[in-house]
Regions:
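A membrane-topology feature that recognizes alpha-helical transmembrane segments
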Residues: 3-152
Length: 153
């Protein structure tokens, strides 16, 4: 391995890398949860602000602790807490997709920042920190447009 330099990272560097990766995934799931509201309501010309989230079958209001992305769907086993009717798996799939895509955008930037090379998909690492939020915005728009198209047209 002559001629190659080895980069060592402190445990704190790896800790921050992991914390920010978890943050990116969680943020992606939360944004995608809101996108689910938009996917359902925008084609119907309904407000995305009010009324609050509710079951599409019985119209029972969904409480805040039943509205946690991915986890609530799993805890409730994909059913409404009130009427026990099935809730579409699309909701959790969109949330997971948002989380994974936000995580991949962060890892693409972080791999260049921490590792100085980008093993992910062989792409060049992102140049600056503002690129990641822009990628997140683009990903959000693509998820919204794609699922509205799949669901309603």
């Amino acid at each position: 391995m002559r001629g190659q330099s080895v980069i060592y990272y402190s445990p704190m560097d790896l800790y921050y890398f992991f914390v920010f990766a978890c943050f990116a995934f969680g943020l992606g799931c939360c944004i995608a949860s809101f996108l689910n509201v938009c996917i359902w309501r925008l084609p119907r010309n309904e407000s995305v602000v009010s009324p609050p989230s509710h079951c599409p079958k019985c119209n029972a209001r969904i409480r805040w602790y039943q509205n946690i992305p991915v986890l609530s769907w799993l805890v409730l086993r994909g059913r409404c807490a009130n009427c026990h009717e099935p809730i579409s798996a699309r909701y959790v799939m969109v949330e997971l997709l948002g989380g994974v895509l936000f995580l991949l955008a962060y890892l693409q930037w972080a791999s260049g920042f921490f590792l100085r090379t980008s093993p992910l998909l062989g792409l060049q690492p992102f140049a600056d920190i503002w690129t990641v939020p822009v990628c997140w915005l683009v990903v959000s728009g693509l998820i919204l447009g794609s699922f509205i198209d799949l669901e309603h047209f």
